[in-house]
């Protein structure tokens, strides 16, 4: 963002923190690859359960993948939140899109980079993969990403309805 060029001191501080954290992560990487114990440099947020399986800590390769992903996401978000001169609305909008993109690119979302999904596929003899592909094909055919099964909600049984009026409407929601 061009705002950083207008604030060279803040940019310098940001880059120094990045360089220091990068050096610490590189030392951690060398230690892990050498088979030595090394505490994680970047910890997931307490409510982030994506890396809660012990394999993400106990196996060096998976641990490093987790560490590099968390390092990258943490620094991208820090840079965004510290960007000088951004209007609050612009900052929130950018944070929303960056957070969604970073979450979408998490190693936990891809079979090749998710040891938990790989283990599940082996345990289930591929049934989890087959079911996932079926859901994907259903979503492609429906031209939407469904979060529930189409028949999950029935008016009067699992879905309540009452007469009402819209009391609040904005870009994200309607409150009735």
Where are these regions (language model features)?
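Conserved beta-strand in the GNAT
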Residues: 176
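Amphipathic, low-complexity, repeat-rich surface-exposed segments
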Residues: 1-173
């Amino acid at each position: 963002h061009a705002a950083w060029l207008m604030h060279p001191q803040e940019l310098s501080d940001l880059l120094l923190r990045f360089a220091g954290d990068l050096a610490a992560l590189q030392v951690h990487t060398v230690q892990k690859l050498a088979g030595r114990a090394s505490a994680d440099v970047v910890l997931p947020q307490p409510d982030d359960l994506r890396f809660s399986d012990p394999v993400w800590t106990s196996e060096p390769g998976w641990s490093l993948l987790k560490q590099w992903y968390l390092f990258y996401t943490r620094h991208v978000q820090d840079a965004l939140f510290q960007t000088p001169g951004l209007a609050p609305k612009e900052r929130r909008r950018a944070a929303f899109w960056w957070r969604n993109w970073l979450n979408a690119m998490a190693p936990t979302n891809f079979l090749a980079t998710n040891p938990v999904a790989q283990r599940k596929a082996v345990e289930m003899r591929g049934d989890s993969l087959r079911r996932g592909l079926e859901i994907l094909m259903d979503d492609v055919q429906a031209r939407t990403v469904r979060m529930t099964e189409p028949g999950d909600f029935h008016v009067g049984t699992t879905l309540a309805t009452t007469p009402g009026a819209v009391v609040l409407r904005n870009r994200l929601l309607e409150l009735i």
